[in-house]
Amino acid sequence: MPRTGGDHGDSDSWALGSHYWASHLHKPGYKARFGILLDMVGGQQARFYHEYYSTKYARAMVDLVWHAAAVAGYSSYFPQEDGGGITDDHLPVNEIAKIPCIDIIPYYPECQESSFGPTWHTVSDDMRHIDKNTLKAVGQTLVQTLWEL
């Protein structure tokens, strides 16, 4: 299962770019309506479950994106199930910048090597394992999401 829990560890060791951006917005008072983090969205047999912090901070966006996936015909890629929480770049956007941001990240609950998939952080984590159908499902889902706004 992806890393869970309320302790995000040392904030000086992860998501440095999003920490900096959330703390130093490019315009004073800048406020985006929402954010969508795409993390490792091209893997073979990827499925994108509801991520805990996404539902905690931006439930309406989770609902909108997963609904858009169903409308676009990609509900098999976006199951209506919880997949645990992950300490990722969307946390500083939510917690520091106060912009509702979701994380679309694969979760492989049956994978023995890693819940992020069998090639994650291995020498096999390369372009040979990118699936054009998964990328299409995510891309078309995002187009449908924007259409529904």
Residues of each region from the PLM?
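Acidic/histidine-rich catalytic neighborhood of metal-dependent amide-processing enzymes
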Residues: 1-60
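Active-site-adjacent substrate-binding region
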Residues: 34, 41-149
